[in-house]
């Protein structure tokens, strides 16, 4: 309980980081002119009238590819701090990180075998 003052900078940053986008949306909502009409409700495609329907179905393969990318992108987020403090943490954290990477490699092999990485 006595160490809570060490987090004052964190809470201040969190509050400011939350208030900036809220204030930006609120101020733009107050100052922006409101114009409604058929031209405002129509689709816009590079300055020309849209051709065809706007709703397209994407193949599930794109979603699987994106999901695999996000998983390994998050892996990088977790491994970067570990790599920066590798010499301080010791062997036990190295073993934990190795197990983490091993689990992700098993997941990558599974996704590869299932064809989630095939683009064609």
Swiss-Prot record:
Pfam families to which the protein is assigned, alphabetical: Oxidored_q4 (PF00507)
Record-level Gene Ontology MF annotations: NADH dehydrogenase (ubiquinone) activity; quinone binding
Record bears the keyword Transmembrane: yes
Subcellular location as annotated: Plastid, Chloroplast thylakoid membrane
Record keywords: Chloroplast, Membrane, NAD, NADP, Plastid, Plastoquinone, Quinone, Thylakoid, Translocase, Transmembrane, Transmembrane helix, Transport
EC number: 7.1.1.-
Main subcellular location of this protein, as a coarse class: plastid
Biological processes, Gene Ontology terms: photosynthesis, light reaction
Catalytic activity: a plastoquinone + NADH + (n+1) H(+)(in) = a plastoquinol + NAD(+) + n H(+)(out); a plastoquinone + NADPH + (n+1) H(+)(in) = a plastoquinol + NADP(+) + n H(+)(out)
Residues that span the membrane, as ranges: 9-29, 64-84, 88-108
Record membrane topology: Multi-pass membrane protein
Example of a GO cellular component annotation carried by this entry: chloroplast thylakoid membrane
Similarity comment: family membership: Belongs to the complex I subunit 3 family.
Binding partners and assembly: NDH is composed of at least 16 different subunits, 5 of which are encoded in the nucleus.
Biological role: NDH shuttles electrons from NAD(P)H:plastoquinone, via FMN and iron-sulfur (Fe-S) centers, to quinones in the photosynthetic chain and possibly in a chloroplast respiratory chain. The immediate electron acceptor for the enzyme in this species is believed to be plastoquinone. Couples the redox reaction to proton translocation, and thus conserves the redox energy in a proton gradient.
Designated name of the protein: NAD(P)H-quinone oxidoreductase subunit 3, chloroplastic
Organism annotation: Lolium perenne (Perennial ryegrass)
């Amino acid at each position: 309980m006595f160490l809570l003052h060490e987090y004052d900078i964190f809470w201040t940053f969190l509050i400011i980081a939350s208030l900036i986008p809220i204030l930006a949306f609120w101020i733009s909502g107050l100052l922006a002119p409101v114009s409604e009409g058929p031209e405002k409700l129509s689709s816009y495609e590079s300055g020309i009238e849209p051709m065809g329907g706007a709703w397209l179905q994407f193949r599930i393969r794109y979603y699987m590819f994106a999901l695999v990318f996000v998983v390994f992108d998050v892996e990088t987020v977790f491994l970067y701090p570990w790599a920066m403090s590798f010499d301080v943490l010791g062997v036990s954290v190295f073993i934990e990180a190795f197990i983490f990477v091993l689990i992700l490699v098993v997941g990558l092999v599974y996704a590869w075998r299932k064809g989630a990485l095939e683009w064609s």
